Every structure is written in C-alpha cells, then in structure tokens.
C-alpha cells in the first residue's frame, strides 16, 4: 500500500491490545493502562482516494549520558535500569502533583545503547541510555527534571530532546512530507471507521517499508574513517529522488534505474564550472604559522602531563551493545523488571519535582522531517558528462554508440566539428585528410571528489578537425573546388579596368613598377598596438561624461562643500572646457616633405561574391530541409523533455468567503450579524490553473434554487431557509469534496474563522470538529489569539486532516507590496483592476428590492472567491510548500509555520542517524552561557559618490556553505582551540577535551582556522555539514541547469520550487550554528570560524585586486561575500573581460568549491553607504538597454510613498542617462508643481506601514498608522488590523504643533471630507527632498534650494460642501468663500439689503456671462464624472443603469472620480447660488 503524507499529527488514546504493544511487565488492560500516542497520517493514494492511517507503537524518546551516573552506583546494569525507570516515574508523579503509588507508568522502556557524540570530535563510541515515554507531553517535563538534578540527585546532559516527536518519527522511518509512504501487507482494517476517508488502516512502525531503504554506515572503525557509501550515492533520499526525476526528464533513463541517476550525476560533474586541469591552491592565513606553533606546544604539554600515552586505541569497546541506529528498529522493546525496586529506594529530589509546576512551560513541538542513502553505479556517459544539455544545441542529437552515418551532413557555422566517442565503443576514425588527435582531459582536480572521496576516472575525448568547407551531403562533392575567401569583393569601375577578382584571405597586393601608386613605408598601427600604447602610457580607454548643467541659468554662482569635498558646478559652454596644451611647432619632416595625394579617381562599388539564389534553388532547398527534418524527428523526439507528473500532487483545495448583513456599515460581528450567503470555489488539482467548481449557498426563504440558478448557470447554487441549514450544508460540502487544503483570503475575522465563531456563538456548535476528517476528535479548534505564534504567522484554526491557509499572510513572503489588500494583490499579479465594495454598499445591494442588484453582489463575491485560488496558482504557493516539504522532510504546515533551524535539523538528523551520531540538547541557560560571538563579517564603508566608470560586482557563490565544505568545518570535526585559557576548553555550550594521543597522530591532518580553532581534515573524518551542503549545492546546480531548457510552465514551477528550497537550507546552515539567543544546538566557535574565514578570504581578494597594475582596478566597496571593483577608464566591453579575469584568478587561489563569480557591472552607479547603492546594471556584453537596480534606498523601501519612489527613480534614471543636472532640476520642479496644483493622485501619497497593536505600550508612542487604526476601532471594534498588516494612511494639513499621529487619516476618510487637504509642504520637505538630496549633495546640487527658488502655483479656492444641518466646516477657505464672489472668486460680494447675494457687483452687471460661466463649469465636471463612471462600469462589468459603488484604494480612477464628484457638488452649489443671486 502506498499513499502520500499530506497531514500528520498525533493524539493520546487508550491502549488497545489489538494494535498497541507497550512492552513487557506492564499492568494488564484490566488495570486501566495509561494512554499511548497514536500518530495519524492523512494522504492520497494513486487513485486520488483519501487515506487515513493510524500508526501505533511509536514512542517518543530521549538520550542521557550513561557515564554521568552509572559509575557511582554499585549495581548491575539491569538493576540500575530498573531503578532509573522507577525514579523517573516517581519524579514525574511528584512533578504532576500526583500520588506516586497510583500514578500511571510514564516510561515505556529504558535501553542501553552506544553512539558517537556529535558535539566536538570524538573517535570512539560512548554509552547512552535511551528512555522511551508513553506520552510526548511528559518529555519536556522529564528533560527539565534531568537538568535540575531531580532524578538520582544528578545533573545530567540530555540528548535529542529538541527533536519534536513527529519529526523524530519521520527521521527514524525515512519519511518525507508530501512524499509517499510504503506499507507492507501487515495492515489492520476495522469495521467501525474512525474517519470519513475512503481508506482507513492501522499499522505498526514495522510495516513502514521506507525505513528499509536506509542502511547503517559503519564509518567509525578506524582513526581515518572510511566512506561506506558509493561514490555516486546521495545520503538524503529526497535529493536522490530529484536526481532520478531529472534524469527521467532529460531522457537519460535506462532499464536500470540507478544507471539513469549515474548518467545525470556524471553529466553534472562534467559541467561543474570549477573543474580545471590544475589543482587549486589553498591560501595561507596571516596568523597560520603562529597557530601551528600553538598547536604543537599544546600537544606537547598534554602528552607530558598525560599518564596514558601508550594506551591502545579502542574505537568500539562494547561491540555487543546496539547502536542508536539499530536500536531504533528493534522490534521487541526490552523492558527491565521493576518489581524489585521499592519506592523507599528511589533517590529523587522531591523539592524540585513538586515545584515543577511553577517553572515556565515549554511549548511542545509536534512536527516532522526526513533523509536516506542510495547507492548507484558509475556509468560511462561521455556525451552527457562533457556536453550536458546546453552546448552545441544546433547540432543533431548525438549519443554514445550511435551510427553517425544515419545523420545528414550539414554545413557548420564553425570551422571545426567536435566528435566524441565512448571509450568502450570507439569506432575507427573516418577517412579524412586530417588525422584524429586524441586528447586526454581531466575535468577534475585532485581536490574535487565525488561522494565517498573516490577520485573521478579520466576519459579520452577525440577531436576530428575537418576542412573548413567540407561537403554538405553525405557523399563527397568532387566538383566543388572553391577555396575559402571573403564574402564580399571589391572592384573599381575605370575606363581601362573592369575585371572583378576574388581576393583570397592570404592575398597580399604586389604593384608593378609601371603603375603609379603610393604604399606606406610603415604600416599603420593595429588596434592591439593602440590599446597596448594606451595601457603603457596609462591613457584611459573611455572618458566618461561629467555631471554638468546644460542650462547656464541653472548653474549656481558658488561652490558647495559636502563630506569634505568641494564641488564646482560646470556647464557645457566653451568657457568650461580645459585649455588645449600645445607649443604650435610642426615636425621638420612633415614641413619639408608634404604628403602628395594621388589624382587617381574612379567609381567604387561593393559586389557580393556569390549571386543571390534563384527561386528554383530556394524551392529545392526547402524540400531538402523538409527531408532533413523528417530524418531528425526521431532524434528530436528522443530529446523532448518528458516530466513524469507526481501522482500524489493532485491535492484538492477549497476556498470560502462569506457575506454577512451588518448594521450601520460596520464590519460584521459574529455575535450579532448572521451569515446571509456563503461562496466557495473548488480546485481538484492545485497544479492546474483551472477552477473546477464554484458555487454559493444563500439564505432566502422566498426564493428557490431555480431563480438563482437561471442567473448563474455555471455555478452550483443552493438556497436554504435558515442560517443553521447553511452551516450544515457547508459541512456536507466539505465532506463531499473532501479537500486537503481549505483557505480564505483572511481566515480569522472572515471566511472560515467567522463561520466557526458564528456557529459557536449562535448554535454552540464545534464546527472545527465537524469539518475535520475524523468522526470524533479533540484537537480541532479555533484558538485565535490564544495561540499567538500561529495567529501572527499562519492560521490559528486547527482542522484535523486539513490545512488552513491564510492567503494574505503567505503572500507577505512571496511578493513585496505596499498594501496586501485583495485588490492591490490582483493588480500586481494579474495586472488588472478588481472592484471593492465596502460593507455598507454590500448591505445596500443585498437589501435592494431589485434582483439585479443582488446579482451584482453575488458576482462580486464569487469573483473574490475565485481570486483566492487563482492567486495561489499564479504564485505556485502550494507547489513551493509541497516541494520544500518533500526535500526537507517536514510536514506541509511546518514549512510555513516553523523556522529555519527546524528545517536544517531535519536534514542533519537524516544524515547523522545512520552514522550513529548523537546530538546534545542544550537548555536556554546553556545557550545563554556559551561564549559570545566575536567575529564580524567584513563590510566596508564605501566612499559616497557617483561612479562614472564601470563598477564590476564580484560575488562569492554560497560563501559560507563553500567554506564549510572546503575546510571541513563541523561540530564533529572540531578539536577545540589551539590556545587554552584558564585551563578550560569550552566548545559552544559544553566543555570539550580531545585525546592528546589522537591529536598527536593526526596533527598533520589538521586545519587551523583564523580564529584559532583546529578541525580534522576530510581524510580523517568528513564533515557532516559538508556532506549535507555538497548534496544540496550540487542538486541545486543540476536543477537550475535543467530550468534553462525547460519549456513547460508546470515543470518550470516545480523545478523553481525545488531550487528555492535547496537554496534556503544551504543559506541558513551558518545561522543554525550562530543562533546565540534561540539556538537549538548553536556553537559560537564554529560560527566565528566560518565568519573569520570568510573575512580573510574577502580581505585577501581585496588586497590582490588593489595591487594589480594592468587594469588599475580599485575595490570601492565590499560586503561579506561581494566586492565592488571600479575600473577607471575602461569601456563596458573591457569591464566584462577584466571582471571575468579577476574572478578566475581569485577563484584559483582558494580550495574548491569556493568560487568568485563575476555577476554584473554597474555603469554608472551611486554608492551611498553600507548596503545602500543604485545603478544601471549590465549582465552581458550584448545587453544594450540597462536595468535600473537599487538596494536599500527609497525606491525599493516600503516605508515611504509611491510618489517618493517614482520621483527618486525618475531623477536617478535621468541623471544616469544624461549626466545633466538641469534636466533633473526641471523634472523635480515639474513634479513639485503638479503636486501643489493637485494633479497627482491621492493614492500616491499613501503611507503603508505595518501595524502591531499588541506591541505598543502606550498609544502616545505608537506610529501614525496605529493611532489611526485605534481611532477607527472606537467606531468599529471589528475593524482591528491583523498582526503585521500594512495600514494605509494620509497626512493632512492641520494647525501648527499638531502631531503627525493626529494628522493621519484613512484614504476613505479623506475622500469623504471635502474640507480636508493634504499637507503638501510635509510631503515635499519631509518625503521627497531628503532622499533626493542624499544623491544630489554628492554632486554639489541641492533639491531643497531648487524647491525654494521655483515659482509656487496659486491654488484656486473651492467652495466646501455643506454638511448635515447646513453647518459648514469653518476653515480659512470656507471663511474666504463666504466673503468672495461665487463666480469670479476675486471680488467681495455685493451686499444687498433683504436679499441673499453671493456675487460681486461686476458679475451682477453681466448676468448672461455669469450664468454661462457657471453652467459651463458645472457641465464640464458632470461630463468628466460621467466618463469616469463609464470607465468604472466597464471595469466592474456593469450596465449603464447600474450604480457604481467601487471604492478600491488601489485604483487611480477611483481617486479621480471621488475628487471630480466633490468638485461637481461644489459647482452645483455655486450654480445654485449664482442663479439665486440673479433671481433665476
């Protein structure tokens, strides 16, 4: 039986003798044995049926050091194990404040095993006690008791307690999330099913066949450890599956599955870019000699003080004991008798146990992960090894052992043809005027080895060099005797010279004496000669344009000093040009012998050497090409990219949205507002972009299914009579469709969260239990804010058997947006607008008597529900999560809810378990007490300036992972410091001591890091971290190479998801060692070694580049793993050549796989400060148009406004293209003018910053967005923003001294109030000018001065709209409007007794012109408003009679419409006043 692991959790259930085997000497079932853990796995089989599997007899366990207390007890091992077991039960009973005599047993078994400590180099096995428990809940409690010394009065170090129960199970049995689990025939099916799944089984862990793919690697049998795995094998099973899948896709399959992997593996190694003929050297550190001396002295002193110098080395003192790996799969749990130990004999610290309840609780971790070894043979595949899939794409597909005569001959673009023969089936070379020249190529240096350390075999490759113009058919063409020549010929049409001659390449003209001609005695210099002279004289090849002013009036009359540098403004007129330096002398030779030019004239033309083809020739050529394509089609078919789709990837997903009818336009409240309609969308396969079914359930007593069905023929419509029926129908729909994933755009305050809260409050209904896949469960719940971590990171809704996705929160990690509303996400992903209706408008549509308006609401909600699934599909969110779960080995939900350390451990444990390594589990106190991190990466402070010369960006690829691999760094290879301080050797959170005899034997195979720590080299013990990272990096390179020739969107999504998962794990491995606050197994010394080594590598590279003379390169900035190198006077083409040369030279100076990659050039660019730069990016020589790229500045930051981003980017682009400050000034002043004139959309002024209301102690210290949200919540409590939600707000003008928080308003508040005005001065002076001035000040210019000197537009006053009750807002504008003429807005009104007048005397004298003006303005605004309404109706797919209710904050048309609507109302009031004043 086989099915995928889509969902996994556990629960405690009563012991059932039919399934559970708890061990020997336990009370019988009649005595009510304690509950036992049962793991529940939900998945899909190949027939897409849902499967529920209950796995019994899997118990959580921890390890403790046997040597910590065993030697102090005068007991035999069985007796000691019994006493320890009884002591643990007694201590747990006291900690639980229960009676020890009646407390149910908590320990399932205690077993003595052996393993290799992972934390620090250890060469021999040590004893450990494996303690299995009945409940995972007791594990953390027991760990605390051990650490406090409450058991046997001994403080004991605990091992592997930080590995959660489910992850422990998945690692032990080689299981991976979203990957198949294989079961044997020993499965049990019962009649009374516990779930709603199609298939339900009960199994024991022995039935899981995945564990059979693992095998123990006995590598700890010698001082110089052997590698038990095959050279081509992978230690992580999930990575081996990726290689097999890619081999199948590239058609490298064979009858033997392992051969397919081997072919691809050898192909990948042949394509490794760091392969070279010469071995790469290892750079010596500055303090290396001193460190080696310290190590020698340390060994000498320890040997002198040691008494067991001649003690023989024993690597396995207890061969009879099971290893930790073999103990995992022991079927019979050996349980010592506990009848002989009385309670009075137990040594337990009761004070510690009874006070346990006062200790801080440690949250249980319930997650999982996986890894495996596969062994493969090495095949002979020279073609794929050398060529891969990307070279010689224009050639017919060639493979080893294929008859070359089957392929048609065709002319080559190149003058050479490469033919590669397999070493086993090399045919005799064809007859050719040139002989085959064998050439041995070794693409691997001695330092580059495959898995296991075996060197890669050399192969012979034969190259056949044919003639340049070889025949184009299979038979030799004897009639073609043309020689190679130029494509064009040159002739002169003279009276006596009409012959056109073909010029061979080696032709040199020899003029006869009777012809009058001039030949230079000295040939002109070639381009190479000129370049050489320029290099010698240090003349720049390119002189960049300096920053200047194109307009004389813009040039300031003074110089500006900034950062200690004086800037003198320059223009483009002649007075700014440097004077020409010359003494006016003329060469004597030129003066006496002037050059005489020939009076020889003639007409010159160019003619093609070969005439144009005739139509007949073209038709013959087409027929030949057609035949050629028919011949090549089988080969092309064999090269087609076939990707076998995962049969378990068809995960079903259900999206749900609700409409609730609230009062007063408030956000729906589940305690008050009933659910009127439920909308759903269903997708059978998340990999498909098609939505299979949509529908809705509506509460309407007066309507029927047919009335709604006629309007929505493509939807599944169901009309119910009550809200309770609606909830029951949702439950029925959920069970019928049986989705693995349920989702909503926001699932806490709406969607599933609202549905659950409403059912609980109104009907006292436990909806999560009904929605689960189990008939009865206690783990389904909606804790909301009780589980703070899930509430703020994923979803706090727990439905057993199904995953709940909170889409908007997942999108925060996928796309960088200023606002994560559904409308803005759709706009940025699909590039189209979607309407937004507020709650009041939705209620209005629902309560309308017109069914058509109800239909508008239903269509609106259905579209929003569809978008939930379309967004998931477009961003490939589910595919990314599933691929990451399959690679890392954790369950689906842990991918988005757990941190990087949890994911690293999943892979580390999978490699460590078969090698019998055992990991310590530090307490929070131990982590805090380890040595502080000392090393810092090298981050230079750049010289802030504009760099007009090309700046080459060099980046060390995966520097920290490469350092770990190159220098064999790991916990298990660290010997400790070479210098001991205070006689103590502390490694991370533990004290570590190395055997001086062992260190003395391997002293020549030790690497000493720059921070003074010693590590054994690879030939002694291969670093486990290096093993893991090698496989991750090699697999990612292979996947990325496969993406280049992938033409399927689905396959590209899968491959991209895989390489992202691999990249994530490789990049966070260093962080796992350096997590000094929340670390699960940190080691500050190893982290310092990695950082210090990286610092030394970057420092050496910096010094090497700065000392070069041939290119005058200068490092202007460096950051951790990258270098910015300025090349003065170089052209763009030269910059690419020099950059590649620098990268190759530096790469050769460090051991593999450390590689410096030439990434790009910036030309030109600004360097502002650390991690803040911007420039025009070029990634290839052929790239014509530059790409604007910025890091750390306002154009990419999200704490500003869109208008700020747009202005800064526009000015920088102009500056980079023209170097003209006058043009930049004009653009800046134009934008400021448009802003002050009110021509910039209001949405471009919105700030959108994250709000976390629970984090602010006082409202007075909260940011403006939080203050505004609090103010809105006083009116609408359910409008509370989600944790981390970006809340948009505007800054309006107010009285001087008003705080920014009190001037912040929501966009809808601003638009609904015609008297509010944006604080334009704040936006210009505080938002636009400062970021721009940071660049302009470097050039001697100032945007602040440009703004002060520009003319400011006068804004005309607009009559403010009256509010209810006729009361107007008494702003300065309204006061002036009361005194000014409503028509001309210039003169004061004419006061007429006993009459209300709003016109001045001039306008009263000319009533026709006054009325005409008022009517014209009124009609103009109405016409514009009508046009905007038509645009909105078209976007919302409404008819001309439908109301436009859209209020999308992501649409510029909405802001324009709202502004025009306000102006239209103002003009209507002005027209009414004007007509009233004229008695109309």
From Swiss-Prot:
- Indicate, by first and last residue, each region the UniProt record lists as having compositional bias (Basic and acidic residues): 457-468
What are the TM regions of this chain, as residue ranges? none
Positions that bind [4Fe-4S] cluster: 1432, 1435, 1446, 1451
DNA-binding found in the keyword field:
yes
Q: Which cofactor does it need?
A: [4Fe-4S] cluster
What are the binding positions for Zn(2+) in this chain? 1381, 1384, 1400, 1403
Q: Where are stretches of biased composition, namely Polar residues?
A: 411-427, 470-479
- Quote the PANTHER family the UniProt record gives: DNA POLYMERASE ZETA CATALYTIC SUBUNIT
Q: What is the protein's name according to its record?
A: DNA polymerase zeta catalytic subunit
Q: What is the lineage of its organism?
A: Eukaryota, Fungi, Dikarya, Ascomycota, Taphrinomycotina
């Amino acid at each position: 039986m086989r099915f995928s692991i889509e969902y996994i959790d556990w629960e405690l259930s009563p012991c059932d003798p039919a399934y559970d085997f708890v061990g020997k000497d336990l009370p019988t079932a009649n005595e009510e044995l304690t509950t036992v853990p049962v793991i529940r796995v939900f998945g899909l089989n190949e027939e897409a049926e849902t499967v529920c599997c209950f796995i019994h007899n899997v118990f959580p366990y921890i390890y403790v050091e046997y040597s910590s207390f065993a030697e102090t007890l005068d007991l035999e091992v069985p007796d000691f194990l019994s006493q320890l077991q009884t002591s643990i039960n007694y201590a747990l009973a006291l900690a639980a404040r229960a009676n020890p005599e009646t407390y149910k047993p908590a320990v399932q078994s205690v077993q003595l095993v052996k393993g290799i400590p992972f934390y620090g180099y250890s060469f021999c096995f040590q004893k450990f006690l494996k303690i299995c428990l009945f409940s995972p809940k007791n594990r953390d409690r027991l760990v605390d008791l051990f650490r406090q010394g409450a058991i046997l009065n001994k403080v004991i170090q605990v091992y592997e307690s930080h590995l959660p129960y489910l992850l422990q199970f998945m690692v032990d049995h080689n299981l991976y999330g979203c990957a198949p689990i294989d079961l044997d025939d020993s499965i049990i099916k019962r009649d009374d099913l516990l779930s709603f799944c199609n298939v339900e089984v009960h199994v024991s862990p022995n039935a899981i066949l995945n564990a059979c793919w693992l095998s123990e690697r006995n590598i700890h049998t010698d001082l110089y450890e052997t590698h038990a795995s095959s050279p081509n094998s992978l230690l992580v099973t999930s990575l081996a599956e990726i290689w097999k899948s890619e081999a199948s896709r590239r058609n490298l399959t064979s009858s033997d599955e392992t051969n397919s992997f081997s072919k691809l593996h050898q192909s990948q190694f042949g394509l490794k870019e760091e392969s070279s003929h010469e071995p790469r050297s290892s750079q010596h550190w500055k303090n290396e000699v001193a460190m080696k001396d310290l190590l020698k002295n340390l060994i000498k002193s320890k040997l002198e003080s040691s008494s067991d110098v001649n003690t023989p080395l024993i690597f396995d003192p207890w061969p009879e004991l099971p290893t930790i790996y073999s103990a995992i799969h022991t079927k019979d749990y050996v349980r010592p008798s506990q009848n002989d130990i009385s309670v009075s004999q137990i040594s337990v610290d009761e004070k510690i146990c009874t006070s346990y309840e006062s200790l801080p609780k440690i949250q249980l971790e319930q997650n999982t992960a996986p890894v495996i070894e596969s062994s493969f043979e090495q095949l002979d595949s020279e073609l794929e090894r050398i060529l891969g899939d990307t070279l010689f794409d224009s050639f017919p597909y060639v493979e080893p052992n294929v008859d070359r005569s089957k392929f048609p001959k065709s002319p080559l673009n190149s003058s050479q043809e490469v033919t590669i023969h397999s070493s086993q089936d090399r045919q005799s070379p064809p007859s050719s005027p040139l002989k085959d020249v064998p050439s041995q190529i070794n693409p691997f240096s001695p330092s580059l080895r495959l898995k296991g350390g075996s060197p890669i075999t050399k192969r012979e490759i034969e190259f056949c060099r044919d003639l340049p113009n070889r025949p184009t058919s299979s038979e030799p063409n004897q009639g073609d005797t043309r020689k190679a020549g130029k494509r064009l010929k040159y002739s002169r049409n003279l009276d006596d010279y009409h012959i056109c001659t073909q010029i061979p390449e080696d032709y040199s003209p020899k003029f006869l004496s009777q012809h009058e001609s001039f030949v230079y005695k000295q040939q002109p210099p070639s381009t190479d000669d000129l370049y050489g002279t320029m290099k010698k004289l240090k003349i720049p090849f390119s002189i960049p344009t300096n920053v200047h002013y194109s307009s004389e009036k813009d040039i300031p009359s003074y110089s500006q000093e900034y950062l200690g540098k004086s800037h003198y403004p320059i223009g483009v007129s002649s007075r700014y040009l440097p004077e020409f330096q010359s003494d006016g002398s003329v060469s004597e030779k030129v003066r006496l012998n002037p050059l005489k030019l020939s009076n020889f004239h003639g007409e010159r033309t160019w003619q093609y050497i070969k005439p144009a083809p005739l139509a007949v020739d073209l038709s013959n050529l087409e027929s030949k090409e057609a035949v050629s394509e028919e011949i090549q089609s089988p080969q092309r078919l064999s090269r087609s990219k076939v990707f076998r789709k995962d049969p378990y990837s068809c995960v079903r997903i259900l999206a749900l949205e609700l409409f609730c009818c609230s009062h007063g336009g408030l956000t729906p409240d589940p305690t008050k507002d009933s659910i009127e309609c439920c909308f759903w969308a269903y997708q059978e396969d998340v990999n498909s972009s098609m939505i299979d079914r949509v529908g809705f359930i509506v509460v309407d007593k007066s309507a029927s299914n047919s009335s709604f069905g006629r309007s929505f023929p493509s939807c599944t419509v169901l009309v119910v009579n009550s809200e309770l029926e609606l909830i029951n129908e949702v439950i029925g729909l959920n069970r019928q469709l049986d989705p693995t994933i349920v989702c909503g755009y926001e699932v806490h305050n709406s969607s599933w969260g609202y549905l659950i809260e409403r059912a609980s409050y109104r009907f006292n209904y436990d909806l999560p239990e009904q929605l689960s896949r189990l008939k009865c469960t206690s783990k389904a719940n909606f804790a909301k804010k009780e589980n703070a971590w899930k509430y703020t990171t994923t979803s706090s809704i727990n439905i057993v058997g199904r995953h709940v996705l909170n889409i908007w929160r997942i999108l925060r990690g996928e796309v960088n947006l200023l606002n994560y509303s559904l409308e803005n996400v759709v706009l940025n992903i699909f590039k189209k607008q979607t309407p937004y209706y507020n709650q009041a408008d939705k209620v209005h549509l629902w309560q309308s008597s017109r069914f058509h308006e109800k239909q508008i609401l239903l269509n609106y909600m259905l579209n929003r529900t569809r978008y939930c699934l379309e967004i998931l599909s477009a961003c490939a969110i589910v595919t990314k999560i599933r691929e990451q779960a399959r690679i890392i080995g954790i369950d689906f939900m842990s991918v988005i809810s757990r941190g990087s350390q949890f994911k690293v451990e999943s892979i580390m444990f999978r490699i460590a378990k078969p090698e019998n390594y055992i990991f310590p589990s530090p307490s929070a106190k131990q982590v805090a007490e380890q040595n502080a991190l000392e090393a810092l990466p090298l981050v230079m402070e750049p010289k802030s300036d504009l760099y007009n010369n090309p700046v080459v960006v060099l980046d060390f690829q995966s520097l920290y992972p490469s350092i770990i691999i190159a220098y064999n760094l790991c916990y298990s290879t660290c010997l400790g410091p070479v210098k001991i301080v205070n006689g103590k050797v502390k490694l991370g959170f533990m004290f570590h001591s190395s055997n001086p005899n062992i260190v003395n034997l391997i002293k020549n195979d030790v690497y000493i890091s720059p921070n003074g720590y010693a590590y054994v080299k690879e030939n002694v013990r291969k670093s486990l971290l290096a093993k893991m990272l090698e496989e991750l990096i090699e697999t990612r390179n292979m996947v990325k190479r496969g993406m280049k020739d992938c033409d399927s969107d689905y396959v590209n999504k899968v491959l991209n998801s895989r390489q992202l998962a691999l990249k994530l794990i490789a990049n966070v491995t260093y962080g796992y060692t350096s997590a000094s606050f929340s670390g699960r197994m940190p080691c500050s010394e190893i982290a310092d070694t990695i950082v210090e080594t990286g610092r030394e590598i970057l420092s050496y590279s910096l010094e090497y580049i700065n000392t070069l003379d041939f290119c005058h390169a200068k490092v202007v900035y460096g950051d951790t793993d990258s270098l910015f190198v300025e090349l003065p006077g170089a052209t763009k083409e030269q910059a690419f050549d020099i950059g590649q040369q620098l990268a190759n030279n530096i790469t050769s100076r460090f051991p593999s796989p450390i590689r410096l990659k030439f990434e790009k050039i910036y030309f030109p660019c600004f360097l502002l400060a650390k991690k803040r730069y911007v420039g025009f990016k070029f990634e290839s020589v052929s790239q014509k148009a530059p790409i604007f790229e910025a890091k750390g500045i306002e154009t990419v930051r999200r704490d500003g406004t869109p208008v700020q981003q747009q202005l800064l980017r526009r000015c920088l682009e102009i500056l980079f293209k023209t170097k003209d400050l006058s043009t930049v000034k004009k653009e800046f002043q134009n934008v400021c003018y448009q802003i002050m004139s009110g021509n910039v959309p209001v949405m471009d002024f919105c700030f959108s910053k994250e709000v976390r209301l629970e984090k602010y102690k006082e409202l007075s210290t909260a940011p403006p967005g939080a203050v505004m949200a609090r103010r809105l919540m006083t009116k609408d409590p359910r409008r509370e923003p989600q944790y981390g939600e970006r809340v948009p707000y505007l800054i309006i003008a107010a009285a001087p001294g008003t705080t920014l928080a009190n001037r912040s308003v929501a966009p809808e508040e601003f638009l609904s109030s015609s008297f509010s005005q944006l604080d334009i001065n704040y936006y210009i002076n505080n938002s636009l000018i400062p970021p721009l001035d940071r660049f302009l000040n470097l050039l001697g210019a100032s945007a602040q001065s440009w703004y002060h000197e520009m003319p400011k537009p006068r804004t005309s006053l607009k009559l403010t709209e009256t509010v209810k009750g006729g009361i107007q807002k008494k702003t300065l504008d309204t006061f002036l409007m009361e005194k000014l003429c409503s028509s001309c807005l210039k003169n004061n009104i004419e006061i007429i007794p006993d009459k209300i007048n709003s016109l001045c005397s001039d306008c009263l004298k000319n009533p026709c012109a006054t009325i005409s003006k008022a009517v014209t303005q009124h009609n103009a605004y109405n016409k514009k408003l009508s046009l905007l309404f038509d645009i909105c109706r078209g976007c919302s797919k409404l008819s001309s009679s439908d109301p436009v209710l859209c209020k999308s904050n992501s649409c510029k048309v909405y802001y324009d419409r709202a502004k025009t609507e306000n102006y239209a109302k103002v003009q209507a009031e002005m027209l009414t006043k004007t007509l009233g004043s004229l008695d109309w």
